Every structure is written in C-alpha cells, then in structure tokens.
Amino acid sequence: MSVTVAVDCMGGDHGPVVTVPAVFAFLRSHADARAIAVGREEVLAPLIAPVAKEFGERLRLQPATEVVGMDEAPATAMRNKKDSSMRVAIDLVKSGEATAAVSAGNTGALMAISRFVLKTLPGIDRPAIATVLPSRDGRTYVLDLGANVDCSPEHLLQFGIMGAMLVSAVEHIDRPTVGLLNIGEEAIKGNEVVKQAGELLRTSGLNFKGNVEGDQIYTGGVDVVVCDGFVGNVALKTSEGLAQMLATFLREEFSRNLLTKLMAIVALPALGRFKRRVDHRRYNGASLLGLRGVVVKSHGSADAFAFEQALGRAADAAANRLIERIEERMSAMSQEAA
C-alpha cells in the first residue's frame, strides 16, 4: 500500500531545521512513500526547491499560515488557528489526501485537534497515546502515556485492544501478548479499576498474560503494557530521567583519569553497541490510537534522525492497515457481546 504522510513542518522545538531534512531522509529510505510538507510557504519553499527534481511528485508543499505554540492552550489552538500547520496536516488525513500525519508540536493541541477533526473509531471512548520502548527481548509498547489520567476498566480494555492491533500491524505478530501494569502479578493486587480491567482483559480474546510490574517493561515478557495515562506518563518520564543519569555517570567515570580514558577506548565497540540499543531517538514517535486516521506525535526536541523515525512509524502503521485492524477487532467484540 502506498502511503502519503502529511508533515507539520513548523512544529517542535526546532521546526523546519529538523523536520525538512527528516522528510528528505524518509523519502530516500521509503521509495514508495509520498510526503506533504505543511507550513509557511515562504519558509519551506526555499528549503524544498533544491530537491524538487529528486523527489518530483512524491513531495509537495501545502501552505499553512499559522503555527501552534508549544505552550499554547489546546482549546485556543483549536478555535483560533484553523490554518495552523498542525491543523492543516490533520485536515489532509480527514480529506483522504494523506494516509497519516506527523507533528512534533504541542501534544495537548495535537490530541484535541485530531480528536475534533478525525473523531474516534466506533467502540472507542477515548484515544490513547502509545509508544515503544527498548526491552531485553526487543521492544515493548506502552499505553496510555498521558492522554487519560482517570480511566475506567472499559477504557483500559480498549487500550489493550488498540495496543495489540498496533503491535500486530507494525511488528507483524499475529497474537501479541498483553500485560496490565500493576503493583504485583497476583490478580488480587491493585485498585478496583485495575482489578476489574484485569477481568475484562482475561475474557477479551486477547493474548492476555495477566498483571505485570514496572520492571517488565524493560525485562520483557509481554509485547503490550496497558496502564492509565497518569501511571504511564510517570513511568515514561522516570525512564527518560534514569537513562540520562546513566549516560552522565558513564561519561563522568570514563573521563575521570588517564586509566579510565584508556579503558573507554578499549570498551568503545561495546559502548557503541550499547548506545545504539538504548538510543531514545530510534524509538521516537508516539501513536495517537483510537482515531479515524493515523496520527503520530514526535518528541518536541527530536533531531532529524529521531523525527525520521516518527515518519517511518506513521508510514508503517498506515501501510499495515492499523485503523482497519482496530475497527475490525472492535466490531467483532461488539457482535460477540450482542
């Protein structure tokens, strides 16, 4: 399936300096893909002109006169900036001109605009934010990461379904394993919402493996970890802080004296492999699941390499029918319940 990704080129901490080169790299690595660069024409046109011949019809510019600020209130952005690069990118998905949209802009605004323009899929009460993290077994998908602070058991069930369909689509795993994040593996652990969610997941037809603790996000064991947005966001930010601390400690210890500097040289190949495995840029791109269209949120501080990963993540989800998979699963569950 050929995909067209609408790119909010003005969003994020760095804007076109990062997003435009990332679009070029994405098109070079995805020969069948197309991209629509959305943003201020006077800014983007000079950047795109030098590669116009290389990409031809695979890359076009869609003018948008406004930009959503990183600290702007979502309601304000939705009401007052209907020609923002973020809004126009989502509108392109709604109209069918694009099969996915990617933005590094304001998360709250992106979720609000996406939900308003695209609407949620049948059977989905609330969209959720899902991302992939490195684990000992390969990678683990976690949701929700902050879109929904307070959740019902039914919401957590829907997150499990959407997460499983995401992994099935992009990792090509027929029956992804699903775990429910809890304070212990026993079914009696957790608050009432989590315990009831566990019961719903056990009878859902998903490949549910029961409760998992926080360490299993990284030690592996399940493909999808389900939690509410409060817990998920805390877990994610804690992980990011820990990774930064470990990197700082390694740099400090290896630069302490001549001997440790020599040890660093000897260990360089292993350190390089370690860095590649835990490089957060490789995992950039959180999917906004539950919408009638593929939308991926890049980290606001992403560099060109990281933003390219988000573009690839969006293209993979669209090409592998993520939205249709979720619709089909929700429809099947609705028929079973009837």
Swiss-Prot record:
Source organism, top-level taxon: Bacteria
Catalysed reactions listed for this entry: a fatty acyl-[ACP] + phosphate = an acyl phosphate + holo-[ACP]
Keywords, sorted A to Z: Cytoplasm, Lipid biosynthesis, Lipid metabolism, Phospholipid biosynthesis, Phospholipid metabolism, Transferase
Family annotation (InterPro entries): FA_synthesis, Phospholipid_synth_PlsX-like
GO MF, one example: phosphate:acyl-[acyl carrier protein] acyltransferase activity
GO biological process, one term: phospholipid biosynthetic process
Record has Transferase as a keyword: yes
Function: Catalyzes the reversible formation of acyl-phosphate (acyl-PO(4)) from acyl-[acyl-carrier-protein] (acyl-ACP). This enzyme utilizes acyl-ACP as fatty acyl donor, but not acyl-CoA.
Subunit structure: Homodimer. Probably interacts with PlsY.
Family: Belongs to the PlsX family.
Protein name: Phosphate acyltransferase
Organism lineage: Bacteria, Pseudomonadati, Pseudomonadota, Betaproteobacteria, Rhodocyclales
